[in-house]
């Protein structure tokens, strides 16, 4: 599962196409953060993700919640961020896993429901270096201390 852009479908949800990109040396995270509600992507701080499996699990859960009308957020993309969190608090999930003002390594998720949207052209509005989506790349940017902090349920902090 390595490549510059990871593009795949989940077998039981063939109507969704998932695109995952990773950027390093991002210079416009403040601009992206100010437009989060307008842009049809999930922007995730790469320091909080250690593997493709972790990300794929969150994407799968977000699609499940969408398909069974159990979404707790407004979009499938924000549902991906919530699905990374051990907490069910949306604001807390966005603060822990979403991008911040100075975020320099970003993971971008774009989920397209094939019947409803135009094909994705790969433009995620990120000014940075596109790097391969792989466990090796995630492990270089992941901060294990931050991961320990964000993955502890809120009542344990």
From Swiss-Prot:
One GO term describing the cellular component: chromosome, telomeric region
A Pfam family this chain is assigned to: CGI-121
Keywords attached to this entry: Activator, Chromosome, Nucleus, Telomere, Transcription, Transcription regulation, tRNA processing
Keyword Oxidoreductase: no
The UniProt record lists the keyword Nucleus: yes
Localization: Nucleus; Chromosome, Telomere
Family annotation (SUPFAM superfamilies): PF0523-like
InterPro entries per the UniProt record, alphabetical: CGI121/TPRKB, CGI121/TPRKB_sf
GO terms, biological process: tRNA threonylcarbamoyladenosine modification
Subunit structure: Component of the EKC/KEOPS complex composed of at least BUD32, CGI121, GON7, KAE1 and PCC1; the whole complex dimerizes.
Protein role: Component of the EKC/KEOPS complex that is required for the formation of a threonylcarbamoyl group on adenosine at position 37 (t(6)A37) in tRNAs that read codons beginning with adenine. The complex is probably involved in the transfer of the threonylcarbamoyl moiety of threonylcarbamoyl-AMP (TC-AMP) to the N6 group of A37. CGI121 acts as an allosteric effector that regulates the t(6)A activity of the complex. The EKC/KEOPS complex also promotes both telomere uncapping and telomere elongation. The complex is required for efficient recruitment of transcriptional coactivators.
Family, as annotated: Belongs to the CGI121/TPRKB family.
UniProt protein name: EKC/KEOPS complex subunit CGI121
Organism encoding this protein: Kluyveromyces lactis (strain ATCC 8585 / CBS 2359 / DSM 70799 / NBRC 1267 / NRRL Y-1140 / WM37) (Yeast)
């Amino acid at each position: 599962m390595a490549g510059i852009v990871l593009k795949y479908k989940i077998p039981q949800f063939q109507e969704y196409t998932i695109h995952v990109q990773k950027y390093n040396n991002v210079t416009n995270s403040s601009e992206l953060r100010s437009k989060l509600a307008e842009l049809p992507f999930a922007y995730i701080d790469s320091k909080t993700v250690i593997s493709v499996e972790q990300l794929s699990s969150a994407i799968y859960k977000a699609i499940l919640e969408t398909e069974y009308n159990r979404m707790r957020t407004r979009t499938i993309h924000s549902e991906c961020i919530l699905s990374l969190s051990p907490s069910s608090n949306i604001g807390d999930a966005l603060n822990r896993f979403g991008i911040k003002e100075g975020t320099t390594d970003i993971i971008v998720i774009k989920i397209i429901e094939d019947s409803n949207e135009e094909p994705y052209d790969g433009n995620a509005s990120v000014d940075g270096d596109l790097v391969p989506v792989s466990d090796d790349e995630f492990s270089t940017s992941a901060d294990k201390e931050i991961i320990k902090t964000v993955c502890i349920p809120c009542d344990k902090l």
